[in-house]
Each structure stands twice: as structure tokens, then as C-alpha cells.
């Protein structure tokens, strides 16, 4: 059951990140928000699978991975549920829209980046615990650890005000879309390699 949950989580990660890239490129904003709401569920399921494998060895690092995943999930689900409800349904005044509309680059956008910063920390600590002699497991380990360094730009860039000035009109920039698509291209293999990792053995 433990590996089934982890494999299911990996599949959710693969599918949601792929669909996120597709919806970004086709400008289907509502659907891109919807899959972002689902992604944290799969990611937590996948992360708990890595933690279960440790069974005492390196369990502190894997537990940190799970805890940061939980913080990520809370932040991201609040961000995108707000987009799908309060923002999508309309009726917000200008001040509320600046704060809550993701595309305006305000507070809610900063929370989104903070959430993905927490995800980055999660992947870093999970990556430290991945064991396996196969080439695929080694690639997975280093991809998770490298992804952890995204924590720093996710944390620092919103403090510079670069997004608030560049997104004040509420329009999504082409460079922003491409950056997110590049992230998707990087993260989909993590989901695939995680599935293959969990699929090697059964409980």
C-alpha cells in the first residue's frame, strides 16, 4: 500500500505538471490554476513514499522533506483556491484585486513563490535521502537536490519588487510563461523517475 500511494502520487505529479505546461502555452488560465491546486496532493503522496523508505536511516532529512512539502501544499492550495473562487467569480475592488489576483504580481503571487520555495527545500532534503545504485536513482537524487537551489530565487526575487512592477497590468508575459514551461520540463522527469523508483519493489 505504501508504494502504491507513492506511485499514485508520482503519477499525479507527472500528469498535473504536464497539463500545467499545456494550459500555460494555450492560455487556459482557469485550468492551469486547477491543476496547480491538485499538484500538491500528488507531491505530498510522493514525498511520504520517500520518507517511508528510510525507516530510521536519514529519517530526519526525509521528515524535513515531508514537513516542507506540507507547508508548500498549504500555501499553494490557498493561492490557487483564491484564484478559482474569489478572483474568478469577480466582484473584487481594485485594492483587493491587487492583493489577490495572481496575475497582478502582488501579495498572492509572492505567497506562490514562497510556496514553491518550500517545495524546493523539500526536494533538497528528499534528494539527500534517495538511495539506489541504478543510474536512474542517481539522476533522480541529483535532480531533486539541484531543484532545491530554486529556494533562493523564490524567496528573494519577490522582495526586489521586480514582479510587482512587471505584472501590474495583469497580463502574463511571454518570458514568464517560458520560465514556467522550463520548470515543467525539469520537473516532469522527477515525477517519472520517482515512479520508476517506487515501481522497482513492492511492499
Per-range role (PLM):
Residues 1-203:
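Hydrophobic, aromatic-enriched alpha-helical segments typical of multi-pass transmembrane helices
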Amino acid at each position: 500500500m505504501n508504494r502504491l500511494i507513492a506511485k499514485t502520487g508520482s503519477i499525479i505529479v507527472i500528469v498535473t505538471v504536464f497539463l500545467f505546461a499545456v494550459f500555460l502555452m494555450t492560455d487556459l488560465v482557469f485550468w492551469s490554476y486547477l491543476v496547480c491546486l491538485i499538484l500538491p496532493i500528488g507531491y505530498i503522496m510522493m514525498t511520504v513514499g520517500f520518507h517511508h523508505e528510510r525507516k530510521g536511516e536519514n529519517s530526519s532529512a526525509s521528515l524535513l522533506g515531508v514537513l516542507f512539502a506540507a507547508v508548500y501544499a498549504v500555501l499553494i492550495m490557498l493561492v490557487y483556491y483564491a484564484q478559482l473562487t474569489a478572483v474568478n467569480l469577480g466582484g473584487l475592488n481594485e485594492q483587493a484585486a491587487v492583493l489577490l489576483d495572481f496575475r497582478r504580481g502582488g501579495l498572492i503571487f509572492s505567497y506562490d513563490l514562497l510556496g514553491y520555495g518550500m517545495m524546493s527545500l523539500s526536494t533538497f532534503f528528499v534528494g539527500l535521502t534517495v538511495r539506489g545504485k541504478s543510474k536512474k536513482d542517481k539522476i533522480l537524487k541529483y535532480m531533486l537536490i539541484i531543484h532545491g537551489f530554486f529556494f533562493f530565487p523564490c524567496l528573494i526575487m519577490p522582495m526586489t519588487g521586480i514582479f510587482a512592477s512587471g505584472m501590474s497590468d495583469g497580463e502574463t508575459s511571454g518570458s514568464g510563461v517560458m520560465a514556467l514551461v522550463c520548470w515543467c520540463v525539469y520537473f516532469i522527469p522527477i515525477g517519472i523517475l520517482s515512479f520508476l523508483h517506487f515501481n522497482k519493489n513492492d511492499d
